[in-house]
Amino acid sequence: MTAVLSLGSNLGDRLAHLRLGVHVLAARAVSPVYETAPVGGIEQPDFLNVVVLCDLDAGQAWARAQEAERLAGRVRAVRWGPRTLDVDVVWADGDEPGIELPHPRAHERAFVLIPWLDVDPDAVLPGYGPVAGLAVDRDGLSRLGPL
């Protein structure tokens, strides 16, 4: 079983928050870090993003994502607002009530798809096909290096 999760941080020590998330998720593969502009129209600092692969089913991935956000001090004050750590389950084996899989906006987000290809060049997004074939706007996406 494999889960694909996207992590982002734009508050505080962004790298430390990402490292915490990677640790809590027990990731077996971690993409390079990318810096991206925020999505959603709210003025805020840029994000650092990574994608990880984990040996978790959908329920386990969701539970660990919530735990990582809690440990990083995530406060849900404004939708698409700034956050210490945001962890999205992009895809995972199994069903979990309340989780829409694949993530409903994954196919249009370069900060998910490009790092995903770094850890799995043959990745397939169910319902959309090979990730390498999805057209996404890479403007504003900067690869920084390893976490």
Regions found by a protein language model. Give the residues of each.
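N-terminal beta1-alpha1 ligand-phosphate binding loop
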Residues: 1-37
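Flexible, gly/pro- and Lys/Arg-enriched active-site loops
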Residues: 31-48, 59-147
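Anionic group-transfer/hydrolysis microenvironments
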Residues: 8, 51, 90
